[in-house]
């Protein structure tokens, strides 16, 4: 299941939770975001039991989070562990996204 992060406080609590967090930064008007969204959801079901939290941030409704994360394009997927960004993928590439998830498990 994908968690929705709607404010900076939630973002900070989640990214500092000690778990691996993969966040999809997206926008409702972004075509590629809509295409990859069900794939991200599928990966959350496939890999979510492995101490990884999958989350989404709508960059338009949570602009403070997207500014904090320095988001410049959508979709952007960022991986966090212990409050630090450890990886990032820009673009709607399902193969690269699954590789990012698998690399995060290692």
Swiss-Prot record:
<feature type="active site" description="Nucleophile">
    <location>
        <position position="30"/>
    </location>
</feature>
<comment type="function">
    <text>Participates in various redox reactions through the reversible oxidation of its active center dithiol to a disulfide and catalyzes dithiol-disulfide exchange reactions.</text>
</comment>
<feature type="disulfide bond" description="Redox-active">
    <location>
        <begin position="30"/>
        <end position="33"/>
    </location>
</feature>
<keyword id="KW-0249">Electron transport</keyword>
<feature type="site" description="Deprotonates C-terminal active site Cys">
    <location>
        <position position="24"/>
    </location>
</feature>
<feature type="site" description="Contributes to redox potential value">
    <location>
        <position position="31"/>
    </location>
</feature>
<keyword id="KW-0020">Allergen</keyword>
<protein>
    <recommendedName>
        <fullName>Thioredoxin</fullName>
    </recommendedName>
</protein>
<feature type="site" description="Contributes to redox potential value">
    <location>
        <position position="32"/>
    </location>
</feature>
<keyword id="KW-0813">Transport</keyword>
<dbReference type="InterPro" id="IPR036249">
    <property type="entry name" value="Thioredoxin-like_sf"/>
</dbReference>
<dbReference type="InterPro" id="IPR005746">
    <property type="entry name" value="Thioredoxin"/>
</dbReference>
<feature type="domain" description="Thioredoxin">
    <location>
        <begin position="2"/>
        <end position="106"/>
    </location>
</feature>
<feature type="active site" description="Nucleophile">
    <location>
        <position position="33"/>
    </location>
</feature>
<dbReference type="InterPro" id="IPR017937">
    <property type="entry name" value="Thioredoxin_CS"/>
</dbReference>
<dbReference type="GO" id="GO:0015035">
    <property type="term" value="F:protein-disulfide reductase activity"/>
</dbReference>
<keyword id="KW-0676">Redox-active center</keyword>
<keyword id="KW-1015">Disulfide bond</keyword>
<dbReference type="Pfam" id="PF00085">
    <property type="entry name" value="Thioredoxin"/>
</dbReference>
<comment type="similarity">
    <text>Belongs to the thioredoxin family.</text>
</comment>
<dbReference type="InterPro" id="IPR013766">
    <property type="entry name" value="Thioredoxin_domain"/>
</dbReference>
